[in-house]
Amino acid sequence: MSQKDYKKYKKIISQMVASCQIREWEPENATVSESIENVENTENNDLTIRGTLLDRESESAVYNDITGLLNERYDLLNELLSAWNSTVDSKDSLSVNLPDGRETVMYRVKVADSWDYYEQKAEDIYDDIYIQEVFTPCYLGKLYDEVDGKLYRMEADGFAWSIDENSIKIWKQDWGNRYIVTAKEQNEMTTDVLFIIRKEDTDNKYEIVDEVEMN
């Protein structure tokens, strides 16, 4: 996608969301709030980070987060792109030009008491360079960050970059392991997607830790 197309698309999407502020979120564990300067692709530098404190030594905590967010993000895409006839207001819609040249119409779907809830979901999904390049639900946000020596799973979405055409770097541990999520369409005639989660070490040796199929 050219820079010109990107700017045009970015402008269209910016009309759909009220701001770059993340939604209020009440964590179950500890939280951290920080101010970020020069946040890429945002118009508001006062972006608040809220996250859940994780046990650095617990591999299962990282793995559970990955699978949980896969399900959450995939569900969000289906929710936003589905025709909710009982809740859609046809007068409240926005024509969106997709990166591949197609045009679609986004309707406001009342999924909560506040429109802000919907707008934030739209921002989370569409304000992502990976989505803009390939328009696929196969992505995760920046999952982890470290503040004052403590590891947090982030709720503000600064997006991870793809390692190759199909993979996204999730997290690199101190001892060198990293988690990769690869999304593979099972069948061109269906919307089924197989997410393969694998763990790599510093020698690029890997093991598949799970396969999650969604449709």
Where are these regions (language model features)?
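Intrinsically disordered, low-complexity repeat and linker tracts
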Residues: 24-60
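Assembly/interface hotspot detector across virion components, adhesins/toxins, and nucleic-acid enzymes
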Residues: 30, 144-146, 197
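Surface-exposed amphipathic alpha-helical segments
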Residues: 1-36
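Core segments of small alpha/beta cavity-forming domains
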Residues: 51-148
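Intrinsic-disorder/low-complexity regions
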Residues: 4, 28, 37-45, 176, ...
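Low-complexity, intrinsically disordered Gly/Pro/Thr-rich segments
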Residues: 2-7, 179-183, 190-197
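Short beta-strand edge/turn micro-motifs at domain boundaries
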Residues: 20-28, 190-215
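Surface-exposed, charged secondary-structure patches
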Residues: 141-188
